[in-house]
UniProtKB/Swiss-Prot annotation:
Disulfide bonds: none
InterPro entries: Ribosomal_bS16, Ribosomal_bS16_dom_sf
Keywords: Ribonucleoprotein, Ribosomal protein
Organism: Anaplasma marginale (strain Florida)
SUPFAM superfamilies with a match to the protein in the record: Ribosomal protein S16
Domain of life: Bacteria
Similarity comment text for this entry: Belongs to the bacterial ribosomal protein bS16 family.
Record's keyword annotation contains Ribonucleoprotein: yes
Gene Ontology CC annotation, any one: small ribosomal subunit
Identification of the protein by name: Small ribosomal subunit protein bS16
Entries under NCBIfam families matching the protein: S16 (TIGR00002)
GN (gene name): rpsP
Any one of the GO BP annotations: translation
Keyword Ribonucleoprotein belongs to the record: yes
Length: 89
């Protein structure tokens, strides 16, 4: 089973809101998920409170066991919006 850390779209038309979830890569984007690790609201300006909230401890755990982040989740990590620590540190 290949596991991905991806965004699950919620909200209304033209007012998106996303959950950051861990799910099997074979499941559709808005289908079943293993764990909910955070949220992302693109309607809030970048860097302000409420823009992005991810449980860094759980994200580090899932990355440590081999979960692959999608492009957007990787971008959040690279830009420093989420501080990822090595598992067990």
């Amino acid at each position: 089973m290949s596991v991905k850390i991806r965004l699950m779209r919620l909200g209304a038309k033209k007012k998106p809101f996303y959950r950051v979830v861990v799910s099997d890569s074979r499941v559709q984007r808005d289908g079943k998920f293993i764990e909910h690790v955070g949220f992302y609201d693109p309607m809030v300006p970048c860097g302000e409170p409420g823009f992005l909230k991810i449980d860094a401890e759980r994200l580090s755990y899932w990355l440590g066991v081999g979960a692959q982040p999608t492009d957007r989740v990787s971008w959040f990590i690279k830009k420093g919006f989420v501080e990822v620590r090595p598992a067990g540190a």
